[in-house]
């Protein structure tokens, strides 16, 4: 297509929106898609990739889809601080969930970095950063893949975005396909504390259509519509935080030319700062977590669709063999960690917590919640309660990994970064195992 204009963005948005609706129709009508809980946004991205300029060339999609994904991730992170409120739960159980999740995240990053540098790059001419496309896509999903890929692109390694997006797409499919297999095996072997046999998926989860009696509000109307729409206020707040994030990122680059802080991480910092300041005022009473969560979900749907549709098939083909080895070895490592560590760290409901963690360690939080809904339909494990609190400590580490990894790897310190992740991950796991034995 020609030069970029505002209508170029409108056309891209319209096409992707149409594909999301097609994806939703496919999810509702086709049992195979329902069985594996494939999100409409993923279907939209795959269709857009197949029909777009990278493959068949039937859709007039521009070459800006990857840029849109990079912008949308800033909106997701800007809204993140406002999507939940924190409280206190049983400290010991929250601590175990934190250690299990944080240790696993660090070890997955260490594994990807080390296998890329010490094994794959010795066989193929690869950049040091090749290996971390696996944890960026698996543990972080399409959001983190877009974030880290955009950061690497700004530093001259544009292929990382495609590799990480491919990893995220493979991960989200494996999270459900293998997750359901693990669930059936575990139930048959008596690991489950909540099920006696593998349960079938509720229709609401399969089709994604919520029955009229089960529908919940996507937010509260905190302003009178005669003054300003509640959605307008929350969207304006999110956009303002993204602007602050952009200015902070550009300002940091001017003050320290070697420092390239991604806009998304600066937006998260800006959001956390604003939230911290506003908690002392009555403004906090007019920020609705459900509304911010709904907006974040919308941004994420478009992020996933744009991200997958922007995958460069030529790059995937160029790296197909080492990428396949990386992703398969990552699945094996994650499987071993998830189930072996859970069995030794958690005193009760270890299998349910492992199934949930498998979902988000390879796919997304939504995949983990879907698997947990099957494994623990009555929420007896309180897994989500503990994880919600633990994530307050996990999130800063995750954002730090995504923020600083591109700068460190492109400067040739990838091995040091991976070894630090390994040491920290093993330290957390050792502490949790010792603590678990003492508290028996």
Where are these regions (language model features)?
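Hydrophobic transmembrane alpha-helices of secondary-active transporters
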Residues: 19, 45-52, 65-93, 269-278, ...
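C-terminal transmembrane helix pair
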Residues: 306, 313, 327-436
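Flexible hinge motifs at transmembrane-helix junctions and intramembrane kinks/re-entrant loops
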Residues: 26-42, 55-66, 181, 246-290
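Interfacial helix-loop-helix linkers and transmembrane-helix boundary segments
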Residues: 30-37, 58-66, 83-100, 280-293, ...
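Alpha-helical membrane segments and immediately flanking helix-loop junctions
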Residues: 103, 115, 123-159, 163, ...
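Entry/N-cap segments of selected transmembrane alpha helices
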Residues: 83-114, 235-238, 294, 310-339, ...
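Intrinsically disordered, low-complexity non-transmembrane regions of multi-pass membrane transporters
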Residues: 1-7, 185-232, 279-283, 437-440
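Structural signature of hydrophobic alpha-helical transmembrane segments
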Residues: 4-18, 62-76, 130-135, 258-270, ...
């Amino acid at each position: 297509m020609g030069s970029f204009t505002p209508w170029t963005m409108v056309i891209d948005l319209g096409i992707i929106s149409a594909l999301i609706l097609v994806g939703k129709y496919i999810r509702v009508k086709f049992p195979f898609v329902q069985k594996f809980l494939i999100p409409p946004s993923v279907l939209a991205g795959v269709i857009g990739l197949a029909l777009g300029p990278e493959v068949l060339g039937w859709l007039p999609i521009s070459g800006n889809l990857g840029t849109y994904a990079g912008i949308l991730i800033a909106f997701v992170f800007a809204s993140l601080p406002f999507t939940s409120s924190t409280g206190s739960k049983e400290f010991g159980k929250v601590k175990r969930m934190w250690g299990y999740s944080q240790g696993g995240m660090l070890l997955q990053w260490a594994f990807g970095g080390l296998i890329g540098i010490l094994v794959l790059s010795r066989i193929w001419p690869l950049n040091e950063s090749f290996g971390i496309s696996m944890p960026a896509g698996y543990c972080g999903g399409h959001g983190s893949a877009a974030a880290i890929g955009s950061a690497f692109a700004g530093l001259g390694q544009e292929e990382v975005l495609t590799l990480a997006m491919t990893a995220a797409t493979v991960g989200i499919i494996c999270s459900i396909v293998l997750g359901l297999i693990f669930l059936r095996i575990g139930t048959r072997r008596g690991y489950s504390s909540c099920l006696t046999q593998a349960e079938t998926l509720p229709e609401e989860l399969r089709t994604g259509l919520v029955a009229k009696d089960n529908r919940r509000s996507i937010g509260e109307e905190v302003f009178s519509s005669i003054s300003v729409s509640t959605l307008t206020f929350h969207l304006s707040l999110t956009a303002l935080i993204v602007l602050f994030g952009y200015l902070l990122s550009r300002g940091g680059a001017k003050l320290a030319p070697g420092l390239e802080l991604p806009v998304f991480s600066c937006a998260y910092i800006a959001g956390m700062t604003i939230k911290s300041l506003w908690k002392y005022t009555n403004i906090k009473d007019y920020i609705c977590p459900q509304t911010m969560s709904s907006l974040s979900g919308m941004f994420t749907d478009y992020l996933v669709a744009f991200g997958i549709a922007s995958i460069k098939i030529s790059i995937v083909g160029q790296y197909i063999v080492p990428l396949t080895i990386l992703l398969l070895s990552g699945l094996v490592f994650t499987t071993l960690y998830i189930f072996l560590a859970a069995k030794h760290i958690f005193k009760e409901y270890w299998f349910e917590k492992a199934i949930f963690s498998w979902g988000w360690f390879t796919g997304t939080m939504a995949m983990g919640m879907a698997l947990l809904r099957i494994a623990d339909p009555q929420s007896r494990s309180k897994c989500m309660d503990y994880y919600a609190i633990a994530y307050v400590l996990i999130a800063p580490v995750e954002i730090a990994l995504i923020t600083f990894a591109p700068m460190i790897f492109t400067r040739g310190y990838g091995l040091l970064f991976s070894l630090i992740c390994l040491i920290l991950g093993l330290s957390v796991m050792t502490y949790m195992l010792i603590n678990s034995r003492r508290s028996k």
